[in-house]
C-alpha cells in the first residue's frame, strides 16, 4: 500500500462514516440508542478514533488534511446528535402531555370528604361548652419542668406521681407534662384574679396500653379564681357542663384527694348501668394561691379536669381507647 493509497483510503473511510452515521442518527428512536450510537461513533474507542489512529501511515504534509476533515466530521456528527436528541425529547414531552391531557367535558370523579377525628371534635365541643360559661382558652408547653408540673401544684417530692414509673423524665430537670394543670400556674403568674380559663392539651404518663389506658392522651382542665367562690359554684358548673354534654345521665360526687385542691371530689356518671368516673375536681388549695402571691383570704377558686378520650368513648359508645389511635378508616368513617 502506497502513501497516496493510504490517504485515499482514509478519505473514503471518513466519507463513508459521514453518510452511514447520518443515516443511523436519523433512525435512532430513543435517547438510549442515540447515546450508544454516539459512543460508537465519537467515543475514545469509536470509529472516528480508529480512523484517526491510522494517520501514522501518512506523510507529515498529509496528516493535517485528514485531521481537518476528521474534526469537521466530528463537529457535524455532534450537531446531528444534538438535533436528534432535542427531537426525541420533544417527542417524549408531546407524548407525556397527550397522555396527561384532561378532558374538561368528561364527568368529574367525586373526591370523598374527610372527617374530623372524634378526639378533635370532642375536645372542641368541651371547650365550646366552657367558653359559653365565660371561660377563656389557654394553652401551655408539653415539655415542662418540675416546678410547674409538681411543686407549684403542692405535689410533694415523695408523691407517687413523681416516680419514674409514672412520669416521662427528660434531661435538665425537664419532663413530659403529666396533666394540663401547669397551664393554670402559668396563667396565674401572668394574670391577676379574677380568672376563668379552660386548658385543653396532650399529656403523657407511663401507663401500659390497654382498652382504657394510653401513655399519651388528652385532658381539658378548667380553673376559676374569684371572690366568694365555694363548692356550690364548682358543683353547679360541673353539673351544667355534664348535662350539656351527656344529657340527663345520673351524676354523683365522691370525696377524693388531690394535692392541689381541698376539698376534692371525683365525679361519676351512670353509663350502661354502671358508674363511670369522668372528672376530678375541687377547691384550689390556699397554699397553691399563696405560692403564686395571691391572697387566699380574698380570693378562692375551683379547678376540674377530665380525660377527653373517656368523654369521647362514652359519647360515641367506643369500647376500646386503642381504636382512637389506629387510623383505621373503617372505624373513623363512622364519625
From Swiss-Prot:
Gene3D superfamilies: Bira Bifunctional Protein, Domain 2
InterPro entries given in the database record: aa-tRNA-synth_II, aa-tRNA-synth_II/BPL/LPL, Phe-tRNA-synth_IIc_asu, Phe-tRNA_ligase_II_N, Phe_tRNA_ligase_alpha1_bac, Phenylalanyl-tRNA_Synthase, tRNA-bd_arm
Listed cofactors: Mg(2+)
Pfam families cross-referenced by the UniProt entry: Phe_tRNA-synt_N, tRNA-synt_2d
Cofactor details (free text): Binds 2 magnesium ions per tetramer.
Catalytic activity, as annotated: tRNA(Phe) + L-phenylalanine + ATP = L-phenylalanyl-tRNA(Phe) + AMP + diphosphate + H(+)
Intracellular or extracellular location(s): Cytoplasm
UniProt GO MF annotations: ATP binding; magnesium ion binding; phenylalanine-tRNA ligase activity; tRNA binding
A GO CC term assigned to this protein in UniProt: cytoplasm
A biological process term (GO) from this entry: phenylalanyl-tRNA aminoacylation
EC number: 6.1.1.20
Chain residues that bind Mg(2+): 262
PANTHER family in UniProt: PHENYLALANINE--TRNA LIGASE, MITOCHONDRIAL, PHENYLALANYL-TRNA SYNTHETASE
Complex formation: Tetramer of two alpha and two beta subunits.
Family: Belongs to the class-II aminoacyl-tRNA synthetase family. Phe-tRNA synthetase alpha subunit type 1 subfamily.
This protein's name: Phenylalanine--tRNA ligase alpha subunit
Amino acid at each position: 500500500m502506497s502513501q497516496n493509497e493510504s490517504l485515499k483510503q482514509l478519505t473514503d473511510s471518513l466519507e463513508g462514516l459521514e453518510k452511514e452515521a447520518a443515516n443511523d442518527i436519523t433512525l435512532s428512536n430513543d435517547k438510549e440508542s442515540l447515546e450508544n450510537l454516539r459512543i460508537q461513533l465519537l467515543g475514545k474507542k469509536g470509529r472516528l478514533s480508529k480512523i484517526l489512529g491510522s494517520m501514522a501511515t501518512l506523510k507529515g504534509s498529509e496528516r493535517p488534511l485528514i485531521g481537518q476533515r476528521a474534526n469537521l466530521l466530528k463537529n457535524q456528527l455532534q450537531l446531528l446528535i444534538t438535533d436528534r436528541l432535542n427531537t426525541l425529547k420533544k417527542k417524549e414531552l408531546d407524548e407525556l402531555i397527550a397522555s396527561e391531557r384532561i378532558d374538561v367535558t368528561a364527568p368529574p370523579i367525586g373526591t370523598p370528604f374527610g372527617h374530623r377525628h372524634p378526639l378533635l371534635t370532642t375536645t372542641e365541643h368541651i371547650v365550646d361548652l366552657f367558653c359559653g360559661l365565660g371561660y377563656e382558652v389557654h394553652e401551655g408547653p408539653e415539655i415542662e419542668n418540675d416546678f410547674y408540673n409538681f411543686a407549684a401544684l403542692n405535689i410533694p417530692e415523695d408523691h407517687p406521681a413523681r416516680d419514674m414509673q409514672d412520669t416521662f423524665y427528660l434531661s435538665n430537670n425537664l419532663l413530659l407534662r403529666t396533666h394540663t394543670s401547669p397551664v393554670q400556674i402559668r396563667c396565674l403568674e401572668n394574670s391577676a384574679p379574677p380568672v376563668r380559663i379552660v386548658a385543653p392539651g396532650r399529656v403523657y404518663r407511663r401507663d401500659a396500653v390497654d382498652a382504657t389506658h394510653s401513655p399519651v392522651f388528652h385532658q381539658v382542665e378548667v380553673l376559676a379564681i374569684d371572690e366568694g367562690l365555694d363548692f356550690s359554684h364548682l358543683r353547679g358548673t360541673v353539673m351544667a357542663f355534664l348535662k350539656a354534654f351527656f344529657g340527663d345521665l345520673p351524676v354523683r360526687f365522691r370525696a377524693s384527694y388531690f394535692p392541689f385542691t381541698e376539698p376534692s371530689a371525683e365525679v361519676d356518671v351512670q353509663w350502661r348501668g354502671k358508674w363511670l368516673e369522668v372528672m376530678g375536681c375541687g377547691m384550689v388549695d390556699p397554699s397553691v394561691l399563696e405560692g403564686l402571691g395571691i391572697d387566699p383570704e380574698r380570693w378562692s377558686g375551683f379547678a376540674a379536669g377530665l380525660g377527653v378520650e373517656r368523654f369521647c368513648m362514652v359519647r360515641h359508645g367506643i369500647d376500646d381507647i386503642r381504636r382512637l389511635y389506629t387510623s383505621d378508616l373503617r372505624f373513623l368513617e363512622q364519625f
